Amino acid sequence: GFEFDQRYSRFYQVILTGSGGLWNLMRLYANRHLSELNRNNPVVSGDTIRYLPLYQADQQSYFDKKMREKLGLPVDGLDFISPDAMDPSFFSLEMFDINDLYAAGNPAVVYQGYTPWGKRQRRVAPEKFFEDRENRPQNAFAPTYIALYAQDKFEFDKMFFNLGVRVDRFDANLPVLKDPYIVRPFYRAEETARLLGITLPQGVGGDWVAYVDNALNPTRIIGYRQGNTWYDANGAPTSALSIIRASGGRPRPHLKADSLTFEAFEDYKPQINIMPRISFSFPISDEATFFAHYDVLTQRPRAGQVAQFVDYLFIVQNATLDIPNPRLRPEKTIDFEVGFKQLLTSNIALSISGYYREMRDMVQLFSFFGGYPVSYTSFENLDFSTVKGLNVDIDIRRIGVLQLRFAYTLQYAQGTGSSVTSSRALIGSIEGFNVFRSLLPLSFDQRHTFTGTADIRFLERGVKGPAITIGEKVIYPLMGAGINITYNLGSGRPYTRYLLPNPADVQFGVNPVNLISGQPFSARLPWYNRFDIRVDRDFIIQRGENKQSILNVYVIFLNAFNQRNVLGVYPYTGLPDDSGYIQSPVGQQLAQNQYSKETFEYLYRLKERNPGNFGAPLRIRLGLLFSF
């Protein structure tokens, strides 16, 4: 088979409020050129001397000019205009030029596949962003995905095989930085050595990056870098901190220009993945079967890939934000399972299997510490995780009215990160720290899971239930009726305990650095259990001689016994409804400073009772299904 997929992702957003919103920008841009007084031309009126505003043409914004033109006022006039006093319908995006909208690194518009003024834009050459500075076009995200696959199922000597292979080609169709540490056009080490008339140390590659004493006019080399590994001037491994200290506070690569140009970018290298899929089974005996499968799967990066040139253009101003990384590769999963099925009796089957799943190239935050012109945080294919476990299933086929099924899973899930932002706290608190690489329990590491299902049903072809005779007619009132009971039991998932209560757990805008109690993800939530019950009955509706419809009436009880299951806790106390902050000395001091200590504590405790920390209570659903 063959598959081709190209999707176009466009978006346009105008930010109206806040410090970078359009309304605030209008206040800043209006009359900006009239902020000084013209002290060389005083206006004398009797005993009063007045100074008129000084018109500074080079300080006048494009927005101010367009606003005065639209009002019919002289562009170089001295009238003071208040945008807040005007009808909002008076304004339009066309009254702003690109520099006004970009606001020196705090853009009021975010766009992709549109013009900065909200009109749909055709695809252009990516370098147009740097060439057309009045429009700054940014293309829609248009990745291409091509796949070839083949699969065959056959039998050989009582062995059943299902073999397949899939070849994927993923192209993000995005320009990527030639080196993510350098947001500028730069020279490679061999070029730097040639320009300085020196020879590279033994072991230093010509395609490495040389760090020098002066970025544009170097006289000596201070160190080198290959990928994420740093070296001193002699080619010996060192750290980014050492290069920074030797460079006087900031590492300086040898640059072709100290401004961002298209020369700093290259095309995304398409990723080709070969994914074999193998499964087979064969009988061990007349009552037992062995089975196994091996799969390799890939998926496109989950997050952090769609970067725009504007992200790099203002990287100094936005270095505290997470900058997307367009060079991300697809994430890969390798899955292996082996097991056997055994028929214990004519009605009972046992299945036991063990599985191993490995996730590679998972996306995680990464700090490009020592980057130029500034260190920043982005994303890299760095995370990996393993999930291994054992499944045991017992299936009891229907005997009379009863059918049973029991399933148990023992699982161990470990990895370097549970989400793309798992490393944020460590990256932000340790200077020079790039990424967390230790194996820890993942957030979905649930050690034990048990599911039991019982289905009691009166069928027309089986046990019809009690009979009622009315005259010569025999009625089975329970025929077509049934009850299904599902029981779920599971051990708690891991979380990280803190040594101090955190007001950010309840309040907004407060997030102090906290200390971990023990190891990350070493604490566990409580076990949970819940019953779900479904009661239903089929009613046969005859439509003609040979046609009939079925009306199924059902009622479902979710969490039938209203179990109080804990899904989340506050990391200091380990409780779902008490963060521990209000009882702490800091919390008590905060409460004492309120107008009413009792009211503050009461409202704070109300907010602590986060319903998201608990499973849903008893819910009852009534429904109809009509089949014809």
Regions found by a protein language model. Give the residues of each.
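Gram-negative outer-membrane beta-barrel transporters
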Residues: 351-493
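Outer-membrane beta-barrel channels and translocator barrels
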Residues: 156-159, 283-287, 333, 345, ...
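Residues that define the transmembrane beta-barrel architecture of outer-membrane proteins
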Residues: 142-146, 270-274, 332-336, 386-388, ...
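Signature of Gram-negative outer-membrane beta-barrel scaffolds
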Residues: 1-283
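C-terminal beta-signal and adjacent terminal beta-strands/loops
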Residues: 461-464, 469-512, 526-530, 537-628
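Residues on the lipid-exposed face of transmembrane beta-strands in outer-membrane beta-barrel proteins
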Residues: 148-154, 165, 278-282, 338-342, ...
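Transmembrane beta-barrel strands of outer-membrane/channel proteins
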Residues: 2-6, 163-169, 292-296, 305, ...
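Membrane-embedded beta-barrel scaffold of Gram-negative outer-membrane proteins
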Residues: 283, 289-301, 305-308, 313, ...
